[in-house]
A protein has these predicted regions:
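Helix-loop-helix junctions that connect adjacent transmembrane segments
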Residues: 120-129, 143, 150-268, 412
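Extracellular loop-to-transmembrane helix junctions
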Residues: 28-59, 411-413
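Hydrophobic transmembrane alpha-helices that form the core helical bundles
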Residues: 52-118, 284-308
Length: 413
């Protein structure tokens, strides 16, 4: 009896679900300095670079057994010192994101249940319900994550169209391209603050090894999943830029920037220039589904990374041990310190750049020297692509450090 192989669609949905988070709603604000044309260039540059680095990880991964993740590859090719650096960066990012998703998703769950039953539900109950359902999916199998994510992505697309269809149709070209701006208006001086935000919008690298295992070593199919999943995200991001930056003039962004991109303030300001209707409620639903899909994608990558470190197998006991180490630390931290991630979240982008930009280029360079090209997949571009991705990582690290130190211009509206 033949075993049905996972679908390309399912793999693409896992990637799209991981990449598209509720944070994308703040992208038009974060890129308001470079405005639409600049944000389009930055998004395309970041998408290509992040996709390429993910495909580099995929090629390297083909030389190792199914289930091997960063720990095995970095230790073998770059040595123990780099493995510690990479391991700390991976764990920091994935655990902290899981923590944040439990906190925000739990809050939305508590409000949703409270509204449905006509009473008040505690944040803790909301967090446990949100966490319990999604963590079970990851513990059970990647196929269940695939199925659940596909449903949620469908809901996200519908709510996105519902919320933005009219705004996209009504986008005004003079506003979108800022044609009324005074002569000599600067845009590119704000690129350094836009880059880290766009990088965070294309993070899926923890899922490459998971997908290769899920697709039973079919690397070309994984590569197509990465292409399709990230392209879906790119199209949604560009449409969201058009919806907002095509209706809300650049010089009117001051209150939104002051509120750090808060969606309610964005919609309130936007309503002065366009019909927004019940956009706030629809975007809340979109955000909830985006947080859920991101939780599934991020924790699936963390789950397989931990299983690789400890060499735990796919038996019930092995997956239970892996699940305990994947989910209990962020859950307990979230319940005990519900706002503790605020300080650390600012450093997620910096840590993510290490293992999504710097490490993949180094891994492929060493892998090509040790093994030659991948067993059944070779990423395009050769040596110059490695240089491109490595420099992309360096540029983003520099941009984030300079932004943290407030040494680059910040657009105020």
């Amino acid at each position: 009896m033949s075993v049905k192989t996972p679908s390309l669609f399912g793999g693409a949905m896992i990637i799209a679900g991981t990449v598209i988070g509720a944070g994308m709603l703040a992208n038009p604000t974060a890129t308001s300095g470079v405005w639409f044309t600049g944000s389009l260039i930055v998004l395309l540059y970041t998408w290509f670079s992040m996709l390429s680095s993910g495909l580099m990880i995929l090629e390297v991964n083909t030389h190792y057994p199914h289930g091997a993740s960063f720990d095995t590859m970095v230790k073998d090719l770059l040595g123990p010192a780099w493995n510690v650096i990479n391991g700390v960066a991976v764990a920091f990012v994935l655990y902290l994101l899981t923590y944040a998703y439990i906190f925000v998703g739990g809050d939305l769950t508590a409000k949703g249940i409270g509204s449905a039953v006509g009473g008040e539900i505690s944040l803790t109950v909301g967090q446990l319900v949100f966490f319990g359902i999604l963590a079970f999916c990851v513990w059970a199998s990647a196929r269940l994550v695939d199925r659940f994510t596909s449903i949620l992505i469908g809901g996200m697309v519908l709510t996105f169209i519902w919320a933005t269809g009219g705004l996209i149709a009504d986008a005004k070209m003079p506003v979108l391209f800022d044609t009324q701006a005074p002569a000599g208006t600067s845009y590119w001086m704000y690129a350094a603050t836009a880059l880290p935000v766009c990088l965070a919008s294309f993070g899926f690298h923890g899922n490459v090894s998971s997908l290769l295992k899920y697709f039973k070593g079919d690397a070309p199919k994984v590569a197509k999943s990465l292409w399709v999943g990230t392209l879906i995200a790119l199209v949604i991001y560009i449409l969201w830029q058009i919806a907002i930056q095509g209706n809300l003039p650049r010089n009117e962004f001051a209150p939104v920037i002051a509120a750090e991109g808060q969606v309610s303030v964005l919609i309130e300001t936007l309503s002065k220039f366009a019909q927004t209707g019940n956009m706030d409620k629809v975007l809340t639903l979109f955000s909830y589904m985006a947080i859920a899909t991101s939780f599934l994608g991020v924790t699936l990558g963390l789950f397989d990374y931990i299983a690789d470190i400890f060499k735990w197998n796919d038996s019930i006991s092995g997956r239970t041990k892996t699940a305990a180490l994947t989910f209990l630390p962020p859950l307990i931290s979230c319940l005990l310190f519900p706002t503790g991630f605020v300080t650390a979240i600012g450093y997620v982008g910096l840590a993510a750049t290490i293992w999504t930009g710097i490490i993949p280029a180094m891994l492929l360079y060493r892998s090509r020297h040790k093994f030659g090209v991948g067993k059944n997949y070779k990423v395009y571009g050769g040596f110059w692509l490695m240089v491109w991705v490595f420099l992309f990582g360096i540029i983003n690290i520099a941009a984030q450090i300079l932004s943290q130190m407030e040494l680059v211009p910040v657009f105020k509206g």
